[in-house]
């Protein structure tokens, strides 16, 4: 567990190499409370075996969301239907699910496939099944078809999941997002690797490899860039790197601490921690001009800034009250307000996208856990039950938090829903994983 005020350092070798999916989400709690949904395997309407099964991606996404649980395929009364025209409401009368999705995949030219799917309101169909003939279109929640290539199967599966999630919850799905994180493989010549992958660990890519530690990746609002800290020149420096072109620029290289960079909501600035004038303080730097604005001025340590969605205020961690707590500073006035009071320490805060709640690390009785606090009522809920949690990062739809923790003596990533009901672990094969950062909507 990193302690407050401890600073890591980095260096690098730039790489861009796709590797196998290293993260494998293991659900540990909360599936019993999820909403049941049926996913019928999409029907392959071509010759030979199907290139891929999109419905497997959809089932995994919905289950991993913590909101839904998919029914066992063998329990489905109709297992070979591809459209609502084949749907028989009477067959589904005793199925305990709120919706069913079905679809088809068929060849559509060289390396092209037409994918169609229908999302059916099963509750409505069951309620009206005994009232006489009904138009099946009344049960249809959504229906779409799209032409994709073989390389787009997983991506389009995530897209279908996003549509289903939003149609049934009213909340935008986050299955087409990515995560950045640091992998440490002890014993190797360059053990530190900055990685990005799809939210579920697939399509993993190594952006940086270094003999020195890496830390604090932060996504730009457009999802094209990462800010991070590097010690490649034997001192802390902050860089921004384009994840597609690999081009990068040095943003700060002051004496002492250059740490915890985070993009502003408009992508034009970074909030960061510098100690160039003595104690660690919060600054904001204009990315294009490199102009600096000092935000805090206190003899205690100020660090780990995070933006409010409107870009007008920051939260940050400070020891100015004697122990690490989270404070809010209004950028226009410089007014500082303490936000947290419960527990021994509170640190590493992030504001949820709706601006109403805050996720952070709470230490009580020596245990570090992820917690959520309502900014209006100040009610705090501890979301996790492990001991050494750190570095929480919130999904762009505000429903899930990914964070670092310790499992069986190794640093791993884990996830928890923002209501605390669903928990999952993202173990890896080799090395330790830490410093996760969830991308914006892509």
Swiss-Prot record:
Is the keyword Signal in the record?
Answer: yes
| Location(s) in or outside the cell | Periplasm
SUPFAM superfamilies membership? TolB, N-terminal domain (SSF52964), Tricorn protease N-terminal domain (SSF69304)
Signal peptide range: 1-21
Q: Which Pfam families match?
A: PD40 (PF07676), TolB_N (PF04052)
Cystine bridges: which residues?
Answer: none
Does DNA-binding show up as a keyword for this record?
Answer: no
Q: Which InterPro entries does UniProt cross-reference here?
A: 6-blade_b-propeller_TolB-like, PD40, Tol-Pal_TolB, TolB_N
- In terms of one coarse class, where is the protein primarily found? periplasm
**GO biological process per UniProt:** cell division; protein import
Q: Which UniProt keywords apply?
A: Cell cycle, Cell division, Periplasm, Signal
Q: Which GO terms describe its cellular component?
A: periplasmic space
Q: Which family does it belong to?
A: Belongs to the TolB family.
Q: What does this protein do?
A: Part of the Tol-Pal system, which plays a role in outer membrane invagination during cell division and is important for maintaining outer membrane integrity.
Oligomeric form and interacting partners: The Tol-Pal system is composed of five core proteins: the inner membrane proteins TolA, TolQ and TolR, the periplasmic protein TolB and the outer membrane protein Pal. They form a network linking the inner and outer membranes and the peptidoglycan layer.
Protein name from the UniProt record: Tol-Pal system protein TolB
């Amino acid at each position: 567990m990193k302690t407050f005020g401890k600073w890591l350092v980095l260096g690098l070798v730039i790489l861009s190499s796709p590797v196998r999916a290293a993260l494998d989400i293991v659900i540990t709690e909360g599936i019993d409370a999820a909403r049941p949904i049926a996913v019928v395997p999409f029907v392959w309407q071509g010759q030979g075996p199907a290139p891929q099964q999109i419905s497997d991606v959809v089932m995994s996404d919905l289950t991993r969301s913590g909101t839904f649980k998919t029914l066992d395929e063998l329990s489905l009364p109709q297992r070979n239907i591809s459209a609502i025209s084949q749907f028989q409401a009477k067959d589904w009368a005793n199925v305990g699910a709120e919706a069913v999705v079905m679809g088809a995949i068929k060849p559509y030219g060289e390396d092209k496939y037409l994918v169609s799917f229908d999302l059916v309101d099963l509750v409505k169909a069951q309620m009206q099944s005994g009232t006489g003939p009904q138009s099946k279109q009344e049960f249809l929640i959504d229906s779409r078809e799209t032409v994709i290539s073989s390389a787009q199967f997983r991506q389009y599966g995530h897209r279908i999941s996003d549509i289903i999630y939003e149609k049934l919850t009213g909340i935008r799905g986050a299955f087409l997002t990515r995560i950045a994180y640091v992998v440490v493989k002890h014993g190797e010549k360059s053990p530190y690797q900055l990685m990005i992958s799809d939210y579920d660990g697939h399509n993993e890519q190594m952006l940086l490899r270094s003999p020195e530690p890496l830390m604090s990746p932060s996504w730009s609002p457009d999802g094209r860039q990462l800010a991070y800290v590097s010690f490649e020149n034997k001192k802390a420096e902050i860089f921004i790197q384009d994840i597609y072109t690999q081009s990068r620029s040095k943003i700060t290289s002051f004496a002492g601490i250059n740490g915890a960079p985070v993009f502003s909501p408009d992508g034009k600035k970074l909030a960061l921690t510098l100690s160039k004038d003595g104690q660690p303080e919060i600054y904001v730097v204009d990315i294009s001009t490199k102009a600096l604005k000092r935000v805090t001025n206190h003899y205690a340590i100020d660090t780990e800034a995070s933006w409010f969605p409107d870009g007008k205020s920051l939260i940050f961690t400070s020891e100015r009250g004697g122990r690490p707590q989270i404070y809010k500073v209004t950028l226009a006035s410089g007014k500082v307000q303490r936000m947290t009071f419960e527990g021994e320490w509170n640190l590493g805060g992030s504001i949820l996208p709706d601006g109403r709640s805050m996720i952070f690390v709470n230490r009580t009785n020596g245990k570090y856990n992820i917690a959520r606090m309502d900014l209006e009522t100040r009610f705090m809920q501890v979301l996790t039950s492990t001991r050494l949690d750190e570095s929480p990062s919130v999904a762009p739809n505000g429903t899930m938090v990914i964070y670092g923790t310790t499992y069986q003596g190794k640093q791993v990533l884990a996830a928890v829903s923002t209501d605390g009901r669903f928990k999952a672990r993202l173990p890896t094969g080799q090395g330790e994983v830490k410093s996760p950062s969830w991308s914006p909507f892509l």
